[in-house]
Swiss-Prot record:
PROSITE patterns membership: RIBOSOMAL_L9 (PS00651)
Record organism: Thermobifida fusca (strain YX)
Protein name stated in the entry: Large ribosomal subunit protein bL9
GO cellular component: ribonucleoprotein complex; ribosome
Family annotation (Pfam families): Ribosomal_L9_C (PF03948), Ribosomal_L9_N (PF01281)
SUPFAM superfamilies hit by this protein: L9 N-domain-like (SSF55658), Ribosomal protein L9 C-domain (SSF55653)
Length: 148
């Protein structure tokens, strides 16, 4: 099944990409959730015009992403989470928690969908999370999780 992505899908592509997927994946997951639309010649023409406009914006956004990366590189992020006596958290640290902590630490506003936490953070300590600002700009952000 040939589809045009309308949202970024990990492991598949970014908005505007034309992808070939299995029928069930497209019909049962991508189309109902609005992550993709069916490919037609008319839709392809629209996508081509959108890509040209995006290419012009892409150059500007790369510069912006590099500036944000510099700001994040000098940031000390500290998360206060409820924890038991043994240092184990009640729950875990989410990308929303990290985004709010970055903003509270005086950093730029970061979209929670851009933050990738490789392994669940369930105890106090020092961790590193990856922030994907741009396809060419990734930032490793050290965070300190402190029990309250």
């Amino acid at each position: 099944m040939k589809l045009i992505l309308t949202h970024e899908v990990d492991g598949l592509g970014s908005p505007g990409d034309v992808v070939e997927v299995k029928d069930g994946y497209g019909r049962n997951y991508l189309l109902p959730r609005g992550f993709a639309i069916k490919w037609t010649r008319g839709a392809q023409k629209q996508i081509d015009s959108i890509r040209r406009a995006r290419a012009a914006r892409e150059i500007r956004s790369l510069d912006e992403a590099k500036q944000i990366a510099e700001q994040l590189g000098s940031l000390k992020v500290r998360l206060n989470q409820r924890a038991g006596d043994n240092g184990r958290l009640f729950g875990s640290v989410t990308s929303t928690d990290v985004a709010e902590a970055v903003k509270a630490a005086g950093g730029p506003e970061v979209d929670k969908r851009r933050i990738q936490i490789r392994n669940p953070i369930k105890s106090v300590g020092d961790y590193t999370v990856e922030i994907r600002l741009h396809p060419e700009v990734n930032v490793s952000l050290p965070i300190e999780v402190v029990g309250v």
